[in-house]
């Protein structure tokens, strides 16, 4: 961190990593913010999904034993220790951010005294093709519904199976844009069309071209946001989902679809789809109108980035860290004000010179040979056009090779 002059660390995920980054940041006096994209800080299974009961009872740590045994092949309930470690580190964050209020509430159920901000993800609306002549309509006017993304058990695979079975010999056609975990469903069947993988930017138009009337987002874990929902809304298509997580939160907020209890059956959902089909001019059109109204104010990626930029600037400028010179206690905001007064080449020259002096002191000092060599090498790789590039190599050769060999020869000769 000191070598790279890091002013702020933004952590997005730590899966397959150690938690050392928290302690190193604190030791080096570097502030960090943490954005939670899932529930890894609560359980390493990430999704809070129980294959037997669907809903994870995350508040009851004693009930975690059987789940841990199945998912991690361990007979030790390590969740209390896991949460203790995460909590002690999360308290050090200057800001904790989540993409939905539902996610915030779940995290606060476990870590009750944390301060958490909600910043919804942004999404850039693609230009939808207005040429509806591309729409693929069946002679019998089939009613098309779609599943989107990678459909695993926790993403509602059992409902894809169930609805395919119900749709046989009906006027309902089911489409899958993406792939199913069970390869059996990665091929066409009666009243079922498998489209396979797609580019994210193409999805809204794919939904329109295939005349999709409803999108089924049947996640069985509390998703923290859902870009597939955003893509469905951009295509102005109402959705069916469960009363769970950020998807339900967002659908309720704009009345963009229908929400079912988590233990609803595929038969229940199919019956409802038939009622929507029979009354396509009624409530369905109201949902579409709500979506159109929402799209006028839908947050863009740029707007989201601006929210984060404000947090970055506020955190960097107010955190009491030392500037480049360890003897200079000016605040970061003063440093950046001075930087703006200089042209980029002047700033780079100052950085090169300061770094040269720092590494020269390391070479001349008592630091281990390997560290001195590593610092010298990194400087030469970083500042390839610097006028100090060859000087630092000479300093290393002089102090670490010539001087040491001379001293060694002198010692052997006279002592």
Could you tell me what each predicted segment is?
Residues 87-88, 92, 104-124:
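Helix-loop-beta element that forms the nucleotide-linked donor phosphate-binding surface
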Residues 267, 281-317:
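A charged, aromatic-enriched C-terminal amphipathic alpha-helix characteristic of glycosyltransferases
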Residues 216-227, 248-249:
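Nucleotide-sugar-dependent
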Residues 214-217, 238-241:
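Short hydrophobic beta-strand element within catalytic cores of glycosyltransferases
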Residues 138-155, 161-164:
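Conserved donor-binding/catalytic core segment of Leloir-type glycosyltransferases
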Residues 27, 57-95:
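Membrane-proximal helix-turn-helix segments that form the acceptor-binding/catalytic region
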Residues 181-210:
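Nucleotide-activated donor-binding/catalytic signature segment of Leloir-type glycosyltransferases, i.e.
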């Amino acid at each position: 961190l000191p070598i790279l002059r890091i002013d702020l660390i933004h952590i997005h995920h730590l899966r397959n990593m150690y938690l050392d980054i928290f302690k190193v940041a604190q030791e080096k006096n570097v502030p960090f913010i943490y954005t939670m994209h899932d529930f890894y800080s609560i359980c390493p299974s990430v999704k809070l999904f129980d294959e037997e009961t669907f809903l994870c009872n995350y508040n009851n740590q004693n009930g975690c034993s059987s789940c841990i045994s199945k998912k991690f092949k361990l007979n030790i309930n390590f969740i209390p220790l896991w949460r203790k470690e995460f909590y002690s580190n999360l308290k050090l964050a200057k800001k904790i951010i989540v993409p939905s209020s539902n996610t915030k509430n779940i995290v606060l159920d476990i870590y009750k005294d944390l301060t958490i901000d909600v910043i919804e993800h942004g999404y850039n609306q693609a230009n939808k093709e207005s040429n509806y002549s591309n729409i693929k309509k069946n002679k019998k006017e089939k009613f098309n519904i779609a599943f989107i993304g990678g459909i695993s058990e926790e993403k509602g695979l059992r409902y894809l199976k169930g609805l395919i079975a119900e749709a046989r010999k009906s006027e309902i056609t089911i489409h899958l844009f993406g792939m199913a975990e069970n390869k059996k469903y990665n091929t066409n069947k009666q009243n079922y069309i498998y489209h396979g993988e797609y580019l994210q930017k193409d999805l809204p138009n794919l939904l329109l071209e295939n005349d999709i009337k409803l999108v089924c987002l049947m996640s069985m874990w509390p998703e923290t946001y859902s870009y597939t929902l955003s893509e469905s809304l951009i295509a102005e298509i109402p959705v069916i989902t469960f009363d769970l997580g950020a998807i339900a939160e967002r659908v309720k907020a704009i009345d963009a679809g229908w929400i079912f209890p988590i233990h609803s059956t595929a038969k229940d959902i199919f019956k409802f789809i038939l009622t929507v089909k029979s009354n396509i001019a009624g409530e369905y059109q109201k949902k579409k109108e709500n979506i159109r109204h929402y799209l006028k104010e839908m947050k863009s990626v740029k707007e989201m980035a601006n929210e984060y930029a404000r947090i970055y600037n506020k955190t960097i400028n107010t955190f009491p860290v030392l500037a480049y010179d360890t003897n200079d206690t000016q605040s970061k905001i003063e440093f950046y004000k001075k930087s703006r007064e200089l042209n980029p080449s002047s700033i780079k020259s100052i950085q090169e010179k300061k770094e040269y002096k720092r590494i020269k002191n390391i070479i001349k000092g008592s630091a281990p040979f390997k560290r001195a060599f590593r610092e010298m090498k990194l400087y030469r790789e970083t500042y390839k056009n610097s006028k100090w590039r060859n000087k630092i190599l000479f300093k290393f050769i002089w102090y670490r090779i010539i001087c040491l060999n001379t001293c060694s020869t002198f010692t052997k000769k006279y002592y």
